[in-house]
Amino acid sequence: MKQFFKVLTRIILIICGGLCLLTPLAFLILANLFKASPSDIKKGNEALKQIFISLDLPPEKVESNGSYQFEGGGLDFYVTFSDDVVNSHPVLKESPNLTKNRLKVYVLNTGDISYHSVEDNLFNHGLSQFLEEEGEKYFRENGKKSHSSYTILTLNDPESMKKGIAFYEKALTLVDIHDNSAIKHIDTVTVKPGKEAELKQLIQDMDEAGLLTQKYQ
């Protein structure tokens, strides 16, 4: 009987040892399954670099570890800028995703990199939404709204994105942004006292530049 238990104990130890070895191996396999290929990461880095260069925001470095997030998917790229570039461009300096000159750009996959995805990570969502809502008011007040469900900023190429950045940076001087990140809510935006007329003119200029599009459902 003692011999039986000795053999049984050895078998259990061998099985446990095997499981201990399999656990990190399984983790490595899963990690690689949720990781972009080196060629995709390289293409993503280059795509982001070229987009920012076309916007006159030349980066020093673009990088990503290529790991897809387990919850929700997607992966992060990090775009590093010089002090001069950050300090001379409010759109960068005031970006919620900028930390120590590094801009985090989240995309669903490397093929999703575009001017729209850059805008989505570069701009403050609260201010973007505020400008779209002000665009709705502008259309309504000027009789331009016709069964529109909502208005969006249309920034999908170098030309429109450059224009959009210029207007966005102007908007930053006309509003106060209240950080709601602590409660995980979109930031609240209010017009600075005495800046109402300038904001209305800004919205009109954005419309005339073709940056506000009415969408229908």
Identify what each model region corresponds to.
Residues 82, 95-97, 128, 157, ...:
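Intrinsically disordered, low-complexity coil/linker segments enriched for acidic/polar
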Residues 1-24:
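N-terminal Sec-pathway targeting helices
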Residues 109-183:
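Non-cytosolic head/periplasmic domains of membrane-anchored proteins
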Residues 19-41:
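Membrane-interface motif at the C-terminal end of an N-terminal transmembrane signal
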Residues 33-63, 122, 126-139, 198, ...:
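Short, non-transmembrane alpha-helical segments in secretory-pathway proteins
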